[in-house]
Amino acid sequence: MKGSYKSRWVIVIVVVIAAIAAFWFWQGRNDSQSAAPGATKQAQQSPAGGRRGMRAGPLAPVQAATAVEQAVPRYLTGLGTITAANTVTVRSRVDGQLMALHFQEGQQVKAGDLLAEIDPSQFKVALAQAQGQLAKDKATLANARRDLSRYQQLAKTNLVSRQELDAQQALVSETEGTIKADEASVASAQLQLDWSRITAPVDGRVGLKQVDVGNQISSGDTTGIVVITQTHPIDLVFTLPESDIATVVQAQKAGKPLVVEAWDRTNSKKLSEGTLLSLDNQIDATTGTIKVKARFNNQDDALFPNQFVNARMLVDTEQNAVVIPTAALQMGNEGHFVWVLNSENKVSKHLVTPGIQDSQKVVIRAGISAGDRVVTDGIDRLTEGAKVEVVEAQSTTTPEEKATSREYAKKGARS
């Protein structure tokens, strides 16, 4: 009974101690929470103390670049398609059986190269027949001329009448006309025989064959035997906004050929370089664009017919232009501006007038000068007159590349 009484007292004491500990814990937490607003209020009431606190904090890190003076090319860009300078469907001009093909698919051929042969048997027979008829009529003409000569001698002594002489003269003339017709028939038969050998009409690359050896073909077949595309040179047709026409015309009047570059679909690799050939003679009223044609030598076969490319045409070069990274140019309510760093790394906002720009750099025509440092990263943390810390951009080079660079630097120092 006595042990049970002691146990209850022990439990009561433990509970009391726990309650006291909990009370002190919550009391301390409330005191700390009430102290924070007071500190904030004190800071707000003491501007000088706030500025001292800011100075004690870390400076905003930014990245910067120096405005440089350089020549900047001006490009006009558009989307275009590569087209063959000439595309020819090779068809047979005579009817007959296809006996042979003398090309490999994809082969480069020259004008006049033999491509295919049609069975020439019927054309040889027709030629021989025409030649035989010509020979026969020539013999007839020779005999008629001899008779005419005799008639002319006899007419002098009145042994033949004038009517007989005229009739013989007409026979000679008629036979001469027949000879001309025979000669035309021989030429036609010879031409048919020549056409049985089908040759390339232009230089270019042959495509896939459209018919196999042994088939009967005719001059009316629309598919033809093969298609030749001329790829040396090759053309690029692209479009420009109508607002660019005056710029192109003015550049053409300068007398120098305008350089056109062909870039791949992703605009990351230059495929080839050519020159402007011509502008179309009218604007597309639906799209407000004009077609432009450029020509490329394409000796390396980098361009292929119907290939989609991005076109860039150089129309002008701006000399002594002030250039900064595009990332430094900002837009606000007052217009375009940049943050400029002074010698103490304090920033100030400068309104600028931008010019030519791309994804990497922009020309500044007014507002800053070459040599000025502009902020390119960390701009969202800036205020007028704030002092910042200029840090270098994080390098993506590997340790091995860095070691190689250091080794080259050492070699350069030794040399």
From Swiss-Prot:
Species of the source: Escherichia coli O45:K1 (strain S88 / ExPEC)
Subcellular location: Cell inner membrane
Protein name: Multidrug resistance protein MdtA
Compositionally biased tracts (Polar residues): 31-46
Species lineage: Bacteria, Pseudomonadati, Pseudomonadota, Gammaproteobacteria, Enterobacterales
Reported function: The MdtABC tripartite complex confers resistance against novobiocin and deoxycholate.
Signal sequence, renumbered to the chain: 1-21
Ranges where the record places region Disordered: 31-56, 391-415
Gene Ontology cellular component list: efflux pump complex; plasma membrane
Membrane topology label: Peripheral membrane protein
GO molecular function, one term: efflux transmembrane transporter activity
Subunit structure: Part of a tripartite efflux system composed of MdtA, MdtB and MdtC.
Ranges of compositional bias, category Basic and acidic residues: 399-415
Protein keywords: Cell inner membrane, Cell membrane, Membrane, Signal, Transport
Family note: Belongs to the membrane fusion protein (MFP) (TC 8.A.1) family.
One Pfam family cited in the UniProt record for this chain: HlyD_D23
Induction of expression: The mdtABC operon is transcriptionally activated by BaeR.
UniProt main location, coarse: membrane
Gene3D superfamilies: 2.40.30.170, 2.40.420.20, 2.40.50.100, Helix hairpin bin (1.10.287.470)
